[in-house]
């Protein structure tokens, strides 16, 4: 039996729709995409697979002779994207400076709140725990944007027959409806690249995007947050991020 699982934010509903609408074995109509909403309105038939979500014991399923497929990411970029989409789609907003519930802890400063979120992000994307890397067939969600052929190949691995023209169209719609999230991570990655190269230019970042940049820098330089100078205000230039490294 084929079992399917996914990390929150990893386009699980989208991938189930892909299986059921872009293969010869599937018989569902092509789904309608809603901008920035993924396909949470899509109700899978679960005939071609058994869904295990939010928990899936991959090793136990494999011990029973089942094959386990998942939507996830093996790249740091993809994992930042998954976390961003998971937060945005489940709570309707992403953590902000002085959030009264999540990140405002006993009156901590902007920089201290930023570090809490940054370290949390770094620890999460750096660990392989909960990303289902031990699954038999892993779909990397970044391929929806960059490599539809890999999406078709993944369907083929499942023992299904992909309809390539439909897969390509599906990937265009899936990526377009989530482009805002992809662009946010790409913007942060570009800024971090420029900080590393010491290129000076203005930046406009949300609190969460600033935390992403901060955690990317921690990851790149393999340092702890205590090794960086505390930010006292939102950075408006790459120079402000360059300065905290010195």
Explain the meaning of each model-derived region.
Residues 29, 52, 98, 232-233:
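Selective for proline/serine-rich intrinsically disordered segments
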Residues 21, 32-37, 110, 117, ...:
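Extracellular glycan-modifying ectodomains
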Residues 158-246:
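PAPS-dependent sulfotransferases, especially Golgi type II membrane carbohydrate sulfotransferases
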Residues 12, 147-151, 238:
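A structural signal for well-ordered alpha-helical scaffolds and beta->alpha junctions
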Residues 46-193:
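PAPS-dependent sulfotransferase catalytic domain
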Residues 1-56:
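PAPS-dependent sulfotransferase catalytic core
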Residues 41, 92, 97, 231-232:
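Compositionally biased, intrinsically disordered/low-complexity regions enriched for serine, proline
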């Amino acid at each position: 039996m084929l079992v399917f699982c996914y990390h929150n934010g990893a386009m699980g509903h989208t991938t189930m729709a892909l299986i059921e609408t872009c293969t010869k074995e599937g018989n569902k109509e092509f789904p309608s995409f809603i901008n920035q909403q993924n396909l949470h309105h899509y109700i899978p038939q679960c005939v071609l697979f058994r869904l295990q979500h939010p928990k899936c014991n991959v090793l136990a399923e494999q011990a029973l002779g089942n094959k386990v497929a998942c939507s996830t990411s093996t790249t740091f970029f993809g994992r930042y994207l998954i976390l961003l989409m998971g937060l945005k789609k489940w709570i309707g907003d992403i953590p902000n400076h002085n959030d009264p519930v999540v990140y405002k802890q006993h009156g901590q400063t902007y920089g201290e709140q930023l570090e809490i979120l940054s370290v949390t992000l770094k620890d999460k994307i750096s660990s392989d725990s909960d990303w289902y890397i031990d699954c038999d067939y892993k779909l990397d969600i970044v391929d929806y944007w960059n490599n539809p052929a890999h999406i078709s190949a993944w369907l083929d691995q499942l023992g299904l027959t992909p309809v390539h023209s439909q897969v390509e169209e599906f990937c265009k719609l899936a990526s377009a409806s989530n482009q805002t999230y992809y662009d946010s991570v790409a913007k942060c990655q570009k800024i971090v690249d420029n900080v590393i190269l010491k290129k000076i230019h203005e930046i406009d970042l949300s609190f969460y995007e600033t935390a992403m940049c901060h955690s990317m820098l921690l990851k790149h330089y393999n340092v702890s947050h205590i090794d960086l100078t505390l930010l006292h205000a939102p950075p408006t230039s790459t120079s402000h991020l360059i300065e905290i490294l010195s």
